[in-house]
Amino acid sequence: MATLIGLDWRRIALQGLIAGVIGGILIDAFLYIALFLPQHQPVTALWLNVSATATGHAVANPWLGVLIHFCVSIAWGIGYAYAAATRPTIADRPFISGPVYGLIVMIIMQFVQLAAGVKLQLTATGFLTVLLAHCIFFGLPIAIYSNRAMRA
């Protein structure tokens, strides 16, 4: 069991913040290219979706969507940075732990959406796109950045 006393919380928070921003940018870029661009929708449609989902469709503001999405991404980034700091096995294997972490994030966020009353109408292609987005374009970059930041 890892001890909390010897942890460098400032470094974990900064590392998680940067990793979360990187993951947030990459997952947004991938989801936009895969889901919104083919339908000729602007990138703001992605963030409108986030804000509408988070507020129960009471507010649909793209800037609120960006803020919410990056706050959540940063929180997940800090979560990974903490896990990597306390579990060397996670930190040493970013190409395994990153996609697994992305899968965990995806599953938990699907439950969050269900709890918020959002109907998830994913086709098989949509599901695979969201799975790929979370595992490869979110979890993996967070893990790779965290691995390199811990070595520095």
Range-by-range predicted roles:
Residues 1-9, 146-152:
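Short, charged juxtamembrane terminal tails flanking transmembrane helices
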Residues 38, 111-131:
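Interfacial helix-loop-helix junctions of multi-pass membrane proteins
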Residues 64-81:
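Hydrophobic alpha-helical transmembrane segments
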Residues 14-16, 85-104:
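Internal alpha-helical transmembrane segments of multi-pass membrane proteins
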Residues 37-58:
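Membrane-interface interhelical connector segments
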Residues 75, 133-147:
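Hydrophobic cores of alpha-helical transmembrane segments in multi-pass inner/ER membrane proteins
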Residues 7-38:
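N-terminal signal-anchor transmembrane alpha helix
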Residues 102-112:
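Mid-bilayer segments of alpha-helical transmembrane spans in multi-pass integral membrane proteins
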